[in-house]
C-alpha cells in the first residue's frame, strides 16, 4: 500500500458533508510508486493524462433549484499527486447544497481546487446529460485478444516474464482486452478495466499479452500505477518507436478513472465503453 493512502478516507467511515468542503481532497504523491518502477519526475518515459468522469455532480442555482451534470476531469500524468478516489467523491458530494451563480463559477471552482490537490492544472468540463447521452458508448479500437486460448494459475503479481515477442519482426498494431482486473490497495475492492495497447515495435505475441494482463488479477495497486507498469514492461520488451497504453475502468462510487500513457502527443478520446 502507498504509505500516504493509509491516512486517506478510503476504507473508513466518513461523514458526507453537503456544503462546499475543498479540504476533503486528499492528494497522494506519485513519487513513491514511480520509484518502485525505477523512474522519477525528471525521467518519466511517457506523456499522458488521467481522465476522471463523475456521474454524481450536482449543485444549486441561486433560486435553490438543483442541477445535475456529468463532470470530466483531466489530470496530467506528470502531476506531483494523484487524488485519492473516495476523497474526490466526498469533495464532489460537498457541492450538492452549494450555490453557484453560473456554470462558469462552478467550473472555475473545480479547476482551482483540483489543480491545487494535483499540483498541476487540471482540465474540467461540465457536460449536460443530453450531451453525454447523444455520444452513446463506443468500442475499443483494434483487435480484441480475449478469445485466445491461454492457461494461467498465478494471479498475485504482474508477471512481465510472460510477455514474448519476435525481435526479427517489426509491426504496427492495436490490440485490446476487457480482462484487466486488479484490486484497490486499501480496501481490496476489485477494479475492472479494459485496456488498449497501440505500438510500433517488435512483434508482440498476442497470447502472451493476454496472460500478462490476466496476471494483474489479484495485484493490489491504484489504476494509474497498473497502467504505468504495463507501459514500462511493454516498452522494455518491444523497444517501440511508439507505444500507447490506455485503460478505461468501470466506475465505482460514481467515478471512473481512465489512465492514458504514451510516447507521443496526447490525443485520447474520453468516450464511454459499454461497461461504463
UniProtKB/Swiss-Prot annotation:
Binding positions (NADPH): 85-86, 252-253
Coiled coil: none
CC annotations in GO: cytoplasm
Subcellular location: Cytoplasm
InterPro entries for the chain: GTP-CH-I_C/QueF, NADPH_dep_7-cyano-7-deazaG_red, QueF, QueF_N, QueF_type2
Group of enzyme by EC: oxidoreductase
Keywords tagged on the record: Cytoplasm, NADP, Oxidoreductase, Queuosine biosynthesis
Pathway: tRNA modification; tRNA-queuosine biosynthesis
Functional summary from the UniProt entry: Catalyzes the NADPH-dependent reduction of 7-cyano-7-deazaguanine (preQ0) to 7-aminomethyl-7-deazaguanine (preQ1).
NCBIfam families on file: QueF (TIGR03138)
Protein name from the UniProt record: NADPH-dependent 7-cyano-7-deazaguanine reductase
Taxonomic path: Bacteria, Pseudomonadati, Pseudomonadota, Gammaproteobacteria, Pseudomonadales
Amino acid at each position: 500500500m502507498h504509505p500516504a493512502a493509509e491516512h486517506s478516507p478510503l476504507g473508513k467511515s466518513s461523514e458526507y458533508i453537503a456544503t462546499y468542503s475543498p479540504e476533503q481532497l486528499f492528494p497522494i504523491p506519485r513519487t513513491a510508486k514511480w520509484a518502485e518502477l525505477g523512474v522519477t519526475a525528471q525521467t518519466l518515459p511517457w506523456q499522458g493524462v488521467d481522465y476522471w468522469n463523475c456521474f454524481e455532480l450536482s449543485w444549486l442555482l441561486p433560486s435553490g433549484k438543483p442541477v445535475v451534470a456529468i463532470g470530466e476531469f483531466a489530470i496530467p500524468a506528470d502531476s506531483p499527486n494523484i487524488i485519492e478516489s473516495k476523497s474526490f467523491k466526498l469533495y464532489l458530494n460537498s457541492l450538492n447544497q452549494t450555490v453557484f451563480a453560473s456554470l462558469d463559477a462552478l467550473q472555475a471552482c473545480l479547476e482551482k481546487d483540483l489543480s491545487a490537490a494535483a499540483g498541476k492544472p487540471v482540465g474540467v468540463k461540465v457536460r449536460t446529460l443530453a450531451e453525454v447521452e447523444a455520444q452513446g458508448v463506443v468500442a475499443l479500437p483494434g483487435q480484441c485478444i480475449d478469445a485466445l486460448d491461454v492457461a494461467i494459475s498465478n494471479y498475485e503479481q504482474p508477471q512481465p516474464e510472460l510477455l514474448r515477442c519476435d525481435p526479427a519482426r517489426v509491426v504496427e498494431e492495436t490490440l485490446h482486452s476487457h480482462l484487466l482486473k486488479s484490486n484497490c490497495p486499501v480496501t481490496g475492492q476489485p477494479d475492472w478495466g479494459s485496456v488498449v495497447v497501440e505500438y510500433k515495435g517488435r512483434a508482440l505475441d498476442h497470447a502472451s499479452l493476454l496472460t500478462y494482463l490476466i496476471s494483474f488479477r489479484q495485484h493490489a495497486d491504484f489504476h494509474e500505477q497498473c497502467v504505468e507498469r504495463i507501459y514500462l514492461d511493454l516498452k522494455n520488451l518491444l523497444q517501440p518507436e511508439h507505444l500507447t497504453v490506455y485503460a478505461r475502468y468501470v466506475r465505482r462510487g460514481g467515478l471512473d478513472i481512465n489512465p492514458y500513457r504514451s510516447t507521443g502527443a496526447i490525443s485520447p478520446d474520453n468516450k464511454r465503453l459499454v461497461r461504463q
